[in-house]
Each structure stands twice: as C-alpha cells, then as structure tokens.
A protein has these predicted regions:
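C-terminal flanking helix
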Residues: 18, 22, 43, 125, ...
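A short, charge-rich alpha-helical start-of-domain segment used by transcription regulators
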Residues: 1-23, 33-39, 47, 119
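Structural recognition of an alpha-helix C-terminal capping motif at a helix-to-coil junction
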Residues: 37-44, 48, 59-71
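Sigma70-family region 2
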Residues: 2-4, 43-60, 79-81
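A short pre-motif secondary-structure segment
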Residues: 131-135
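Internal acidic/polar
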Residues: 83-110, 141
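Arg/Lys-rich amphipathic alpha helix in sigma70-family domain 2
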Residues: 52, 67-88, 110
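DNA-recognition helix of helix-turn-helix
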Residues: 70, 74, 143, 147-173
C-alpha cells in the first residue's frame, strides 16, 4: 500500500506554527516586540528554504523550526544593542487583559504571582530557559530537546535539574 503525503503549503505551515514560534520567542527573549521581530525573521528563513524542502522534510520540519527559532533568539541576545536595551528596560511589561470573572483583588494577586514567577524565570541562564521551555512548556521529550539544541540528553537533564532547583529556591516549595 502506498501512502500519499498530502502536499503542504507554506501558508498552512505558517498558520499552524506561527503562534508556537512567537510564544517560544517571547519566553526566551522576555519582550513581545523582539519576539514578533524574531518570529518574522524565522518565517522568512522558512520561506527561503521552503522551495528546497522535500515532502518528508516538510512533514518533519517542526524540530528544525524550533532549532531555527532558538538560534535566532540566541543571536538576538548576543547582539550588543539588545544588551544595552535590556539593561535600560529591566521590567518586562506583559499586557494584562481584564477578566470580568475575577475581582480586582484577585487580578492584583495574580499579576503579583505572575511577576514573581517571571522574575525567577528570567534569572535562569539562557540555556536553562531554552531547555526548560522546550521540555516543560512545549512538551518535547528529553531526546528531542537534546537533538534540537545539539547537546546530550545528560546535559538536558542537568539543565532541567538546575533550573528546577533554582526556581524552587527562589519561589519556595509551595
């Protein structure tokens, strides 16, 4: 029996994965505007490579897309202007959309808790954040994370252990 692979369009890939790439970039860069810019750069690279990809590569492109996204975020963090900008703008401002089902007190407490978690998360090393997000937020296996980042599974486990230990220490074991 022959299995036909349904042709995949660039538009379909973009629609299916743009949100995921944007979320990953926001978590790694802690800045919505930078994340949007990097996500656009990532999909520009995807568009440039799309014509050269065969159907098998297109069907298994998600790990490649994540790897390209992580590398683009790393490049942004390494750039001199970004370091200057981040130093001058320490507070990460997340848009807070009102939720009418919660009281103002609950909303304030929720924002405070989110702020505490975010500040603790930002204190992780860049590699710890990458590994933590890919493993626990995006739910990739340890082996997949290792392959995407070009490190061993032992290194992934070590980064996860250190990240969890750091977060427990900062946030308390609640």
């Amino acid at each position: 029996m022959t299995h036909r692979i349904k042709p995949v369009s660039y538009e379909a890939l973009y629609a299916a994965h743009h949100g995921e790439v944007l979320r990953l970039c926001r978590l790694l860069l802690a800045n919505h505007h930078d994340a949007e810019e990097i996500a656009q750069e990532v999909f520009l690279k995807v568009y440039q490579q799309f014509q050269n990809m065969n159907q098998t590569e297109l069907m298994m492109w998600r790990p490649w897309l994540i790897r390209v996204s992580v590398n683009a975020c790393r490049d942004r963090r390494r750039s001199g202007w970004w370091k200057l900008w981040r130093g001058a703008n320490e507070e990460y401002q997340e848009a807070n959309y009102p939720n009418s089902s919660r009281t103002p007190e609950e909303m304030v407490l929720s924002r405070e808790a989110q702020g505490r978690i975010w500040r603790a998360f930002e204190k992780l090393s860049a590699r710890q954040r990458e590994v933590f997000v890919l493993r626990h937020v995006d739910e990739w296996s340890t082996e997949e994370v290792a392959e995407m980042l070009g490190i061993t599974t032992g290194s992934v486990k070590r980064y996860l252990f250190r990240a969890a230990r750091h977060l427990r220490r900062i946030l308390g074991d609640r």
